[in-house]
Amino acid sequence: MTQIRLLATDLDGTLLRSDRTISPRTAQAMEDARLSGVEVVWATARARHSVHELAQSCGFRGKAICANGAVVLDLADGTPVITATTTIAMASAAAAMDRVRTLMPGVVFANIGPTRFVAEPAYAALCEFADHHRHPHEMTLSELLPDIDEPMVKIVARHPEVPSAELYRAAVAAGVDGVELTHSGAPYVEMAASGVSKASALAELCAVDGISTEEVAVAGDAINDVPMLTWAGTALCPSNALPEVLALADHVLPSNDEDGVASYLEGLRP
C-alpha cells in the first residue's frame, strides 16, 4: 500500500463541525500528523482572512488553498502569507458576468481579490455574516462591476429568488466562457479563472514537494471538491457529503460532526 504523505481537506462540511469550529480532537490529529511527517493542507472556497481566523483558533501552521484554488497561503509563522495567486482577466470577468446576467436576469455580483471584497449594493443586501465571514457593512460597494483595485481571484453571483444550486446548474448547462464555475453549497455561485480549482493548486504544491498523486489523500463534501477528489490517489468523503460526491469516495468517513477527518489521520499513525 502506498504511504500517504499529504492529506488535503476541505473545511466547511468536512473538517469543520456544523457550528463551523474545529474540534480539539481534529486539531490534535492534524498536529500529530505533522509531527509524523504527513502534511495537512486546507483546501477551501474561503478567503484569506477567514482561513487565518480558523488557523489561529486551532494552531494550524500549514498551507491553505483558498478561493477554490486561486490563492495559496503559507501559515507557517502564524500569519497568512500569500505565496501564489491566479487571477481572472478583467475582460473575462466582464464577459462572464454579462453572460450570467443574460441567463438569469436579476442576478447580482461581488468581485473578490486576495484581500479585497467589492459587492454590488443589491448583493450586499442579501448577505449574512456567515456567507463571506464579513458583515455586509464591511463590504466595499460599487454600482458597476467588475470593479476592484487589486487583481481579481473570484466572482460570486447570487439571485434574490433563485436558489444557488439552480443558478449553478443553469450556468453550467448554458456554458460561461473564460471562467471556472463551481458551487460549494453556499448561497451563491463561484467563478475562478478558467482551469483553476482546488485540484490545480494542489497539483502545483505537490509538484514542488515531490509528492505523487498516489501519495495524496483528499477529503471533501461538495461540488467544488470534485476536481481534487478525482485527482488524488485516495478520495475521502464524510458521510454527510452530497450523494453525487459520496459516489466518488474510496472511503466514507464519519460525518463532519463526528470528526471523520481526524479519525482518518489517526489511522495513519505508525
Segments predicted by a language model, with ranges:
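N-terminal glycine-/serine-/threonine-rich phosphate-binding loop
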Residues: M1-V40
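Active-site metal-binding loops of divalent metal-dependent hydrolases
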Residues: L11, G69, G220-A222
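Mg2+-dependent phosphoryl-transfer enzymes with acidic/Ser/Thr/Gly-rich catalytic loops
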Residues: T2-L6, R17, I22-S23, E190-P270
